[in-house]
Amino acid sequence: SGAAGEVPGLLPRGLEARREVYILKIAYPKAEPPAIKFAHRKLKVPGRTLIKKLNLEIDTEVQEGKIVGLKEYIKNKDYTEEIIDYEKLEGPLTVRLRKGGDHFVPLGSRGSTKLKKFFIDNKVPKAVRDRVPILSDDKRIVWVVGYRIGDEVKLTDATKKVLKLKVKRVEEAEVPPKP
């Protein structure tokens, strides 16, 4: 009984057995996808940012004052959407991939945790961890896209300006050519 993502067990005829969280996968070995070479990219706020190397499009929208239907929006949003306190951001928002030693304060947490531990605790497969987009400002991780925002940027009763974030996967065919 090893940890998820450990070295697979070899079976006859070249098959491999690998435990991923609570699933035992038996299959022929696949080549790991190549690492993505991507440093970082500043987001347009408000606006749309296309990141071809990650096949992502990120829409940002700033809203001021009392947000009508906010509770309903929060209740119905999915993992591709988040809403944060815009005034708590420090510097421009940047999208990047994880770096060694990354840490953040996940929403609802009392303290900082290493991003690697966060991924393990949330059962994110090893092969996926280096591909999860990270939104950060000049000081900290703001959103581990698809998983959790940082506690420091959550909405409070004092929030006056919100930033809505929506991430969409785009296939190469959908990426508009350069003019």
Give names to the regions the model predicted.
Residues S1-P179:
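AMP-forming adenylation/ATP pyrophosphatase catalytic core
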